[in-house]
Design a protein with these regions (language model features):
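Metal-dependent phosphoester/phosphodiester hydrolase catalytic core
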Residues: 1-413
Length: 413
């Protein structure tokens, strides 16, 4: 039953046997289009997975979602930034359509913003095409918030209530089987899922438990003088979530160990200088603990799927030295569905200096389409020709492969 208390949303969950299922909703005499979902059996031989994030409504159309629907994946993994909280911007330049009012802070405003985004027909088609596994990032609440610390210190007094409203609206408007949040309490959304014995997913929450970003949350400053990043107790995930992650990986019997992650995990520093303190680079001891665990336990077939940064990149994860240390996993960073990227030529040159980075594409929007079998993981990076054109074509930029048992990425294109 859809009620006003839950913004007239429903979370319909039933016992489904493996196979393809089709569904629809009927309300008020109106019948929805038919949706498709696939439930994995105990030992599936393949998985087609679309990994996507960052769909700022104002800065582009959703041609990438149209392509996702056409590709008919088994599963869509959403890595965060389903909505953006910003107020309306004038149309022109990179803005192709506008938000419906000022920056959102209340439950009604967050609900209205979800309704606006979900009115897009290409996003609707992507939801109807496959089951979704959804996580949040920061813009579901506010840019670069950290636990109960807002981006702007002047907003601290009302931030807890704002976060409560945002978390509730997220639960109401996303396809999740989690219980609804309770105001003024932790809302645990980090969790696990599985695609039979082919892939074990661990979805991380890199916002609710983290220490505030160091050194003023600087971006592109390349300042190596930030001792704060190694202050005792700094964390990206919090103690309980770190234990949860390690326990799942240590106990996994699946072929592939997949981590749904928000910000870049690979080392993206240059001679010790941090490019972006919001990424795992701003929490080096937390990353070092995790990579040391992966190496010590010899966790096989680790694939980290990342969004947030609005660029496409492929990275090799190594313990210790990022150029020569032991390989502990692969990271596939998918670009944004529509959110503006970093296209400055100087930044492209900076990226080429990262020892852990194998390839990058900064200009285009899109997503990553992964094909998984027991033998290999293949990542196809799909890019939108023109995000300002609702009818834009979508093409393949590159394909990258990890052979099972290696944790090593090779460029296939």
């Amino acid at each position: 039953t859809a009620t006003p208390d839950h913004a007239h949303t429903v979370h319909a969950v039933a016992t489904l046997a493996p196979g393809t299922w089709y569904y629809r909703f009927i309300a008020g005499g109106v019948t929805s289009p038919v949706g498709r979902t696939v439930i994995a059996g105990p030992s599936p031989t393949s998985l087609r997975l679309a990994a996507a994030s960052c769909q700022h409504y104002e800065t582009g159309f959703y041609a990438a979602h149209r392509d996702i629907a056409q590709q008919q994946p088994d599963l869509v993994l959403w890595l965060g930034d389903y909505i953006y909280e910003y107020g309306a911007r004038p149309v022109g330049g990179p803005v192709v359509r506008t938000h419906d009012g000022p920056e959102i802070t209340t439950l009604d405003q967050y609900r209205a913003r979800y309704a606006l985004y979900k009115s897009d027909p290409d996003l609707q088609a992507a939801h109807a095409a496959a089951a979704w596994l959804v996580m949040w990032d920061d813009h579901e609440v506010e840019n670069n918030y950290a636990a109960l610390t807002p981006e702007n210190p002047a907003d601290a007094a009302g931030f807890a209530a704002r976060r409560d409203a945002a978390y509730r609206a997220w639960w109401e408007h996303t396809p999740t089987r989690l219980a609804p949040p309770v105001a003024a309490q932790e809302y645990r959304v980090y969790r696990g899922a599985a695609w039979g014995d082919l892939a074990e997913f661990t979805l991380l929450d890199g916002r609710q438990y983290r220490t505030d970003q160091a050194c003023g949350d600087a971006v592109l400053k390349l300042d190596p003088a930030c001792p704060e990043i190694r202050s005792p107790g700094r964390t990206m995930l919090g103690d309980a979530q770190e234990i949860f992650l390690e326990d799942r990986l240590a106990g996994s019997t699946s072929r592939w160990n997949v981590i749904g992650n928000q910000t870049i995990m690979a080392d993206a520093t240059i001679n010790g200088a941090v490019l972006n303190y919001d990424q795992w680079d701003g929490y080096p001891e937390a990353r070092e603990r995790f990579f040391a665990f992966l190496h010590a336990k010899a966790i096989p077939n680790v694939v980290v799927l990342t969004g947030d940064i609005h660029l496409a990149a492929v990275a090799q994860l190594r313990q210790g030295d990022s150029a020569s240390g032991p390989v502990v996993g692969a990271e596939f960073i998918s670009t944004s569905i529509s959110s503006s990227g970093l296209v400055d030529a100087s930044f492209t040159e900076i990226l080429k200096k990262f020892p852990s980075l194998l390839d990058a594409e900064l200009v285009h929007r899109g997503y990553a389409l992964h094909t998984v079998t027991p033998e290999q993981w293949s990542a196809e990076y799909r890019i939108v020709t023109d995000v300002t054109d609702a009818a834009s074509t979508v093409t393949t930029y590159g394909t990258y492969v990890v052979k099972a048992g290696t944790n090593t990425v090779t460029v296939a294109r």
